[in-house]
């Protein structure tokens, strides 16, 4: 008799995706981050749902409603800290996941890669709108500065910014629509993650060697479900340590002051996970040029499959490409640091050099390294 998980219409889909899925036998811990991202998304949706029950998207009461959640709502403080620090863990997993895909050449699965880039963009938009909701100083000024970037678009820029704001400045209408979008976008992310997984299961997972593994596959359950569960436990431990012992470590002290349109903070900056892109934006003196550089810093990932020149898929056996990859990772850390610093010498010149290096590695150095490695293995 056929097991119900193989015959039931719904369970059959889950079985093919998470139980009997043929998986390469040699995938490492770096392959855990996909499932961790799914766990992060579910955690964010659940904690966000409980926060939304007590939050009021109104400029007069938004800040005090956050205070009310932390002081008066049962376990409201831990729900808020899990949600805000959960976003940081989410982006940490996200960037690690992207880094692993670049290192092991998984971007050659172009459909999976492109849906992943779409997920990244939606996640960034969702996180930005979420940062505005507490209506603190950095929330208000961050929203003002970032939405103002749209005014750099020729002809329609000013009208577009006022359309986004719902008025002539960031105000009640802006907060209201940001709350609505922040609430709905994670559900579109779930749908897109389903598409992402569907494309991945069409091709099967890549592996550290970058070779075809059709002759050496094992079922996903129990081998990788146990492995993913261990990763999940470590993630939960890390999140709880962060939320309980140092909840404000990654936040900005300015956000504990209510939004004041008449008082500009000394140094406006976004959350740490956007600092690399913010540093690239600031490194270009021209406004439109900066906005284009900001966009390209993310969209450049989309052309990576076209820039792959090596005969080897993975970087595991390509020492020259490995050096460039870790240089890129270090460069991103440097950009993150620069984004948190004031706009003055020597930070300006360091930011410009780091931005040039970022684009140079992806557009020129990695493809050239691939060609050199091809020549060396002849």
Swiss-Prot record:
GO terms for cellular component: mitochondrial inner membrane; respiratory chain complex III. Heme b b566 binds at residues 97, 196. It is found in: Mitochondrion inner membrane. GO terms for biological process: mitochondrial electron transport, ubiquinol to cytochrome c. PROSITE patterns: CYTB_CTER, CYTB_NTER. The keyword Nuclease does not apply. It is a multi-pass membrane protein. One of its GO terms (molecular function) is metal ion binding. SUPFAM superfamilies: a domain/subunit of cytochrome bc1 complex (Ubiquinol-cytochrome c reductase), Transmembrane di-heme cytochromes. InterPro entries: Cyt_b/b6_C, Cyt_b/b6_C_sf, Cyt_b/b6_N, Cytb/b6-like_sf, Cytochrome_b, Cytochrome_b_C_euk/bac, Cytochrome_b_N_euk/bac, Di-haem_cyt_TM. A ubiquinone binds at residue 201. Binds 2 heme b groups non-covalently. Pfam families: Cytochrom_B_C, Cytochrome_B. Heme b b562 binds at residues 83, 182. Keywords: Electron transport, Extinct organism protein, Heme, Iron, Membrane, Metal-binding, Mitochondrion, Mitochondrion inner membrane, Respiratory chain, Transmembrane, Transmembrane helix, Transport, Ubiquinone. Its main location: mitochondrion. The keyword Calcium does not apply. Its cofactor is heme b. The chain crosses the membrane at residues 33-53, 77-98, 113-133, 178-198, 226-246, 288-308, 320-340, 347-367. It comes from the Eukaryota. Component of the ubiquinol-cytochrome c reductase complex (complex III or cytochrome b-c1 complex) that is part of the mitochondrial respiratory chain. The b-c1 complex mediates electron transfer from ubiquinol to cytochrome c. Contributes to the generation of a proton gradient across the mitochondrial membrane that is then used for ATP synthesis. Belongs to the cytochrome b family. PANTHER family: CYTOCHROME B. Heme 1 (or BL or b562) is low-potential and absorbs at about 562 nm, and heme 2 (or BH or b566) is high-potential and absorbs at about 566 nm. The cytochrome bc1 complex contains 11 subunits: 3 respiratory subunits (MT-CYB, CYC1 and UQCRFS1), 2 core proteins (UQCRC1 and UQCRC2) and 6 low-molecular weight proteins (UQCRH/QCR6, UQCRB/QCR7, UQCRQ/QCR8, UQCR10/QCR9, UQCR11/QCR10 and a cleavage product of UQCRFS1). This cytochrome bc1 complex then forms a dimer. This is Cytochrome b. The lineage of its organism: Eukaryota, Metazoa, Chordata, Craniata, Vertebrata. The gene is MT-CYB.
């Amino acid at each position: 008799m056929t097991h119900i998980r193989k015959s039931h219409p719904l369970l059959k889909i889950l079985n093919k995706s998470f139980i009997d899925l043929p998986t390469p036998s040699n995938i490492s811990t770096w392959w855990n981050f996909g499932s961790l991202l799914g766990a992060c998304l579910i955690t964010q949706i659940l904690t966000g749902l409980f926060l939304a029950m007590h939050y009021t998207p109104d400029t007069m009461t938004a800040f005090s409603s956050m205070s009310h959640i932390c002081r008066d709502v049962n376990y409201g403080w831990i729900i808020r800290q899990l949600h805000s620090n959960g976003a940081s863990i989410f982006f940490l997993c996200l960037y690690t996941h992207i880094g692993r895909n670049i290192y092991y050449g998984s971007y050659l699965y172009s459909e999976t890669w492109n849906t992943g880039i779409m997920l990244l963009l939606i996640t960034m938009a969702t996180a930005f709108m979420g940062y505005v909701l507490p209506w603190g100083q950095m929330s208000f000024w961050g929203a003002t500065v970032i939405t103002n970037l749209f005014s750099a678009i020729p002809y329609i820029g000013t009208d577009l910014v006022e359309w986004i704001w719902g008025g002539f400045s960031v105000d009640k209408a802006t907060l209201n629509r940001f709350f609505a979008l922040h609430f709905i976008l994670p559900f579109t992310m779930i749908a897109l993650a389903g598409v992402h997984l569907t494309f991945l299961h069409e091709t099967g997972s890549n592996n550290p060697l970058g070779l075809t593994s059709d002759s050496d596959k094992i079922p996903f359950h129990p081998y990788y479900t146990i492995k993913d569960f261990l990763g999940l436990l470590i993630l939960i431990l890390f999140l709880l340590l962060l939320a309980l012992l140092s909840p404000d470590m990654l936040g900005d002290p300015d956000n504990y002051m209510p939004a004041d349109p008449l008082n500009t903070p000394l140094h406006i900056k976004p959350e740490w996970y956007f600092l690399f892109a913010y540093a690239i934006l600031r490194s270009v003196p021209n406004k439109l040029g900066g906005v284009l550089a900001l966009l390209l810093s993310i969209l450049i990932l989309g052309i990576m499959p076209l820039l792959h020149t090596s005969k080897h898929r993975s970087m595991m056996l390509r020492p020259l490409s490995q050096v460039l990859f870790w240089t890129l990772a270090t460069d991103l850390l440097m950009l993150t640091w620069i984004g948190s610093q004031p706009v003055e010498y020597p930070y300006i010149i360091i930011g410009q050099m780091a931005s040039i290096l970022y684009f140079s590695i992806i557009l020129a150095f990695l493809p050239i390294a691939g060609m050199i490695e091809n020549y060396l293995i002849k």
